[in-house]
Amino acid sequence: MGYGWALFSVALVSAAQLLLKWVMMHLPPLGALRLWLDPAYAEPLALLMGGLLAYVCSMGCWFMALRRLPLNKAYPLLSLSYVLVAACALMIPEFNERFTFSRLMGVALICGGLLLICLPAGGKGDTPRR
């Protein structure tokens, strides 16, 4: 169940990141805070609160994951959010994200590193010391 909590935390933090990106594209600059009170910005402000709530919920899930998983297995899973956010940002036309070969290689290296860390090697090096 620890991996489930960790993956749910990653999903929430990734959704929060995408939501906050969209919100910041639709709100006035931070220097014009008084404009944020304009009723025309009610929807983006509500989504901003939703994004922040997703971050808080993500932390709660992360705490649950840490109760059940060793840190050396749980912490690398956070890098999945880089992969998820990059992939999802490409699918949102409004973000106008570009995907280059070097970014693809970066995502592939993250995935490869996760496999090396999280999958058991089955060799002597994986047995715990006493």
Swiss-Prot record:
GO molecular function list: carbohydrate derivative transmembrane transporter activity
Recorded metabolic or biological pathway in which this protein acts: Bacterial outer membrane biogenesis; lipopolysaccharide biosynthesis
Keywords: Cell inner membrane, Cell membrane, Lipid A biosynthesis, Lipid biosynthesis, Lipid metabolism, Lipopolysaccharide biosynthesis, Membrane, Transmembrane, Transmembrane helix, Transport
Pfam families found in the cross-reference section: EamA (PF00892)
UniProt GO BP: lipid A biosynthetic process; lipopolysaccharide biosynthetic process
Annotated compartments: Cell inner membrane
InterPro entries from the UniProt entry: EamA_dom, Flippase_ArnF, Small_drug/metabolite_transptr
Record topological domains on the Cytoplasmic side: 1-4, 66-74, 125-130
Membrane topology: Multi-pass membrane protein
Periplasmic side: 26-44, 96-103
A GO CC annotation given for this chain: plasma membrane
Parts of the chain that traverse the membrane: 5-25, 45-65, 75-95, 104-124
Assembly notes: Heterodimer of ArnE and ArnF.
Role noted for this protein: Translocates 4-amino-4-deoxy-L-arabinose-phosphoundecaprenol (alpha-L-Ara4N-phosphoundecaprenol) from the cytoplasmic to the periplasmic side of the inner membrane.
Family classification: Belongs to the ArnF family.
Stated name of the protein: Probable 4-amino-4-deoxy-L-arabinose-phosphoundecaprenol flippase subunit ArnF
Classification lineage: Bacteria, Pseudomonadati, Pseudomonadota, Gammaproteobacteria, Enterobacterales
